[in-house]
């Protein structure tokens, strides 16, 4: 919110925005080897570490989506809240954030889908078999000469179930976001 509203007024916020967005242009494969070395050095090669890394790697896309949505909200809402006596935190929490429900649902769904379906980061960071994700567990069902199809397809259903549950609960906001983006 602060980046979007102050980008034109302050060079700092503009540079911060471009700093976040520039991280989207660096593919994971470029930073994979240094990331593994640093993750091992900082003991981030576990579930907590990979969760932290997912949050950090999700910031650029989430910042991009939120700044685009906040730009569409008229500044007159901010001014009206200031006239009513709201401070900046109240403006964001009581005026701006409720308007951002479709964007928040979109960010949550995209972040969930990205982290849930990711294969590369857990493959290179998680060496302990007890901490592997379901996607890595599916990789085990294929051997050099055969595939255990019964277990493989059962694991596919296990991986699909959370995605369907998230979609069913967020369906209303997904449709609102799609319709809002389609009509000018």
PLM features: what roles do these ranges have?
Residues 1-184:
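A structural signal for multi-pass alpha-helical bundles of membrane permease subunits
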């Amino acid at each position: 919110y602060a980046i979007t509203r102050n980008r034109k007024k302050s060079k700092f916020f503009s540079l911060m925005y471009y700093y976040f967005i520039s991280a989207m242009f660096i593919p994971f494969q470029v930073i994979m080897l240094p990331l593994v070395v640093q993750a091992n050095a900082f003991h981030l090669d576990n579930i907590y570490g990979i969760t932290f890394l997912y949050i950090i790697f999700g910031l650029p896309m989430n910042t991009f989506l939120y700044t685009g949505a906040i730009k569409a909200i008229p500044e007159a809402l901010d001014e009206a809240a200031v006239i009513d006596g709201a401070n900046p935190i109240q403006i964001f929490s009581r005026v701006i954030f409720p308007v951002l429900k479709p964007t928040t649902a979109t960010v949550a769904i995209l972040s969930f889908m990205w982290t849930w379906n990711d294969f590369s980061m857990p493959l290179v960071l998680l060496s302990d078999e007890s901490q592997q994700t379901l996607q890595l567990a599916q990789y085990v069902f294929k051997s050099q000469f055969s595939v255990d199809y019964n277990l493989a397809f059962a694991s596919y259903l296990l991986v699909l179930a959370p995605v369907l549950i998230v979609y069913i609960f967020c369906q209303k906001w997904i449709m609102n976001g799609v319709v809002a983006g389609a009509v000018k």
